[in-house]
Amino acid sequence: MALTRRNLISATILGAAAVAAPMAQAKQKTPLKPMKVSPKRRVLIQSSSRYHNSGYLDFAGDQYEKLFGKEKYEILFIPYAKVAGTYDAYEKQVQDAFKPYGHKIVSIHRFKDPQKAVREAKAIAVGGGNTWALVTRMYEAGIIDLIRERVNAGVPYCGWRQRRLPDVAHH
């Protein structure tokens, strides 16, 4: 499958780590391993970061509690979809959103070795924004397969789109 913008659109909805590897295969020198799905997966994919007039990621509190349980995690945040602003600012926004749940957010850009960061992550969150930038940067960092392996091993994974869901009034 060609690495094109059209093929990457589904990555936002289905989770970049789950679908990006086959798309990146066109540029990879060796074939990727077939995707194996594990029943251990703990995944939450949100179609938006906001709903109606809610704050950033506010409306998903119940889902986060189901995903993470009572355990408090240090969550590895992947901000690579951010194209306007800084990774630091994006990390802070996500830290503030997860603070009420007791989780600590640390962005992958703070690590010298992003692959090691993914291998050692206890939980992973992928922020929304520009899907092309996200998948390209994940591919360049060599973390797509690693994220899939970690998710299939049962590491909690969440991701979201950047935009707000429309508020459709029923009359």
Feature names for model-found ranges:
Residues 23-42:
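C-terminal segment of N-terminal export signals and the immediately downstream linker at the start
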Residues 48-52:
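Short polar catalytic/cofactor-binding loops
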Residues 45, 125-127, 158:
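Structural motif
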Residues 1-15:
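N-terminal secretory signal peptides and thylakoid transit peptides that target proteins
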Residues 135-137, 141-171:
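Class I SAM-dependent methyltransferase SAM-binding "motif I" and its flanking Rossmann-like core
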Residues 82-128, 132-134, 139:
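Portal/gating segments that form or line small-molecule/metal binding sites
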Residues 37-38, 61-73, 118:
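Glycine-rich phosphate/diphosphate-binding loops that line cofactor/substrate pockets in enzymes
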Residues 44, 74-76:
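Conserved beta-strand elements of the Class I
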